[in-house]
Design a protein with these regions (language model features):
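Short, flexible helix-loop junctions that flank or precede catalytic/ligand sites
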Residues: 1-374
Length: 374
């Protein structure tokens, strides 16, 4: 039987993102968004258990057998790190292994806009990177933390479940805490965080009221705080944070959020023309006008404010990003339309031949044929 390291080696060779192990099928690898089967026979329940247990510690085995679910990460020297979620399905063990490259990619390599570097340079406040699972949030955050690590002399504290990218001490002192290995829970780690003299705090996932409340408090007390949510737009992100609190607290939370928020980056990965994937970004920077809209519970007006904040503040809506990617011939029209939540607006943008690259205008020259053109 093929070993787990051999299968993970194949993930790297194929430039894949995930390895799926489950019964009654060969292992499958996600490559550029699509699952591909590995040559070989279907796996039995005994084989999936043997394969997945091969990298577990005794403590991890015990935890999995008690809860029937397990999140952890591990590294294979010279290859990469992997994040794993193990679970039971139809009474058998299954698992998904997500590739985490050993090398942290920088802003230029990821083609991230300058406004994200500006967010990483903030002395304090709350920066949120959001999007669905597998949209590259961890990769973007790793680039931002790496920039801080190289350029500042501060204490970076991360709380993750599990640790994905490993940051070495560079200009900064870096402490990375993994839930279950280094702390019992996010809430325990966050309660202790302010006693650990941090300057920058990364919260791997803002899952519940206590975690969100802690993030706001840490940002409010003068720390640069990064967090993630599974939301798809800036407005949805703000609403999600406010709605997690009881109704009687929401007015206070709107005010608190309006004061500490420094940026929201919502991202999605799309199939790239010619192979691979490319990131689409919605970026919101809270101007005084936007802070006022948050305070006054006029979240629905933020979208218009973002559209007019392109050149000066580096903001862009998701549709502006999609239009730009299409006009630069990086994605197909079908991909752009599939990813858009307002196809009529996107079609109009493309017909006008107008796009924006995070604060820099994209001219009409070289734009593909507008929608509806013959």
């Amino acid at each position: 039987m093929t070993t787990l390291p051999e299968l993970l080696q194949k993930v790297v060779e194929l430039q894949g993102s995930d390895l799926h192990i489950t019964t009654d099928t060969p292992p499958q690898i996600r490559v550029h968004g699509h699952l591909e089967r590995v040559d070989g026979p279907a796996m039995t329940a005994a084989e999936t258990k043997q394969l997945t247990y091969s990298v577990l510690t005794d403590a991890q085995k015990k935890r999995f057998e008690e809860s029937l679910e397990l999140d952890f990460s591990f590294g294979i020297k010279g290859l990469a790190r992997f994040r794993c979620n193990m679970f039971n399905q139809r009474g058998a063990v299954a698992a998904v292994y997500r590739l985490i490259p050993e090398k942290i990619r920088g802003f230029e390599e990821l083609n991230l806009p300058p406004v994200l570097a500006t967010l990483a340079e903030k002395p304090r406040g709350l920066v949120l990177v959001t999007g669905p699972t597998g949209s590259g949030k961890s990769t973007t955050l790793a680039a931002m933390i790496d920039k801080i690590n190289k350029e500042r002399k501060d204490h970076i504290l991360t709380i993750e479940d599990p640790i994905e990218f490993v940051h070495q001490h560079q200009g900064c002192l870096v402490n990375q805490r993994e839930v279950h290995s280094d702390t019992q829970s996010f809430s325990n780690a966050l309660r202790a965080a302010l006693r650990e003299d941090p300057d920058i705090v990364l919260i791997g996932e803002m899952r519940d009221l206590e975690t969100v409340e802690s993030a706001l408090r840490i940002a409010e007390t003068g720390h640069l705080t990064f967090g993630t949510l599974h939301t798809n737009s800036a407005a949805q992100t703000i609403n999600r944070i406010i709605d997690i609190f009881p109704a009687h607290q929401q007015s206070q939370i709107r005010t608190q959020l309006s004061l500490v928020l420094e940026g929201i980056v919502c991202q999605a990965l799309l199939p790239k023309v010619g192979g691979g994937r490319v990131v689409s970004l919605e970026i919101m920077v809270p101007t005084p006008a936007i802070r006022n809209l948050i305070r006054e519970d006029k979240i629905h007006q933020i979208y218009s404010a973002m559209q007019t904040g392109q050149e000066k503040f580096g903001m862009q809506t998701a549709n502006q990003s999609l239009a730009t990617l299409y006009m630069k011939k990086l994605i197909t029209l079908d991909s752009a339309m599939t990813a858009s939540s307002n196809r009529e607006e996107l079609q109009e943008m493309i017909n006008r031949g107008v796009g924006v690259v995070a604060g820099a205008g994209l001219g009409r020259a070289g734009a593909p044929r507008p929608v509806g053109a013959r």
